[in-house]
Amino acid sequence: MNVFEPRLSSWLENAGDDDDVVLSSRIRLARNLKDEQFPVYEQKEEIVDNIAEVFDDNFTLIKMNQISLLQKALLVEKHLISPYMMNKSEYGAVLLNEEENVSIMLNEEDHLRIQCMTPGLRLFDALEAALQIDGYVEEKLSYAFDKEFGYLTSCVTNIGTGMRASVMVHLPGLVTTKRIKSVIEAIRSLGFVVRGIYGEGSMPASNIFQVSNQVTLGKTETEIVEDLTQVMEQIIMQERVARTTLKQKFHIALEDRVFRSYGLLMNCRIISMKEASDAISDIRLGVELGFFEHISRQKMNELVLFSQPAFLRREAGRDMDELEEKVIRAKVIREILGDK
């Protein structure tokens, strides 16, 4: 297993329910050990070793103090660790399975953060996988748990189930029809959070948004997932309506925009992250509307991931200035799109 190779994780490579709109679903469980201090102010490497011993050879342990900053950034871009772990968790580590759809962060904000990812809208599948791992760990290690408050976590907003359920969605139709603001306001009024592609603190890119639950106390894991699934079903329906409206009422203008973006990416020699993200979103929309039969969703996911800064530095084999990064990005994008 070489997680640093330029390949898609299984949750970005395989098909899933409603994957014309939904890229992926994720369940994350935050847990702390009963007899250890948290928040993790004094990050103890022995905590990592003790937890890692619980897992078998199906998982690979990667310690943050044994890899380079570039390798950490690659893990962030693949959504396998958080930006927090990359920047602040010197004695942190991550356990990964071969498919890269299970990532267990150790000594991040909490002792364990178990996250399971699935393609499309499959929150219940992700929940089942996460709870199975959680139960396995709890048989061998004692969690910090309170009968009244539930699982105790470093951040009070995670107390209770300790669960964050999130869905990554592509919403170009709602953005183009200028309905995205009202949709986000409606989502927030229902107690959910809308963030960028890399979660808290990140901005949307390629018209990709992340929707997650805010409440973790007072509801069961199943109830939270049911509520989020219902919200996502409404968002999916509204996005599809917006796409249909664009295709029916503004077909020529839409087709022109999509093919201009395709021409840009096929022929560019210098391109910024913002310009590439906008064009990739246009082409992904074109793929879903049937404009490009030769381009798969998998190829679109490759464009998003492999045009990120860390993957470009890996491709170049060195650090680059801003212009060099734009040149390498253009080259990588042309190669991906040209490989039919």
UniProtKB/Swiss-Prot annotation:
Catalytic reaction(s) noted: L-arginyl-[protein] + ATP = N(omega)-phospho-L-arginyl-[protein] + ADP + H(+)
Record domain Phosphagen kinase C-terminal: where: 21-242
Any one Pfam family match given in the protein's UniProt record, by short name: ATP-gua_Ptrans
Residues involved in ATP binding: 24-28, 79, 113, 164-168, 195-200
One Gene Ontology MF term: ATP binding
InterPro entries documented for this protein: Arg_Kinase, ATP-guanido_PTrfase, ATP-guanido_PTrfase_cat, Gln_synth/guanido_kin_cat_dom
EC number(s) stated in the UniProt entry for this protein: 2.7.14.1
Keywords: ATP-binding, Kinase, Nucleotide-binding, Transferase
Cellular component terms (Gene Ontology): extracellular space
CDD domains reported in the protein's UniProt record: bacterial_phosphagen_kinase (cd07930)
GO biological process: phosphocreatine biosynthetic process
Function: Catalyzes the specific phosphorylation of arginine residues in proteins.
Family: Belongs to the ATP:guanido phosphotransferase family.
Protein name: Protein-arginine kinase
Organism: Listeria monocytogenes serotype 4b (strain CLIP80459)
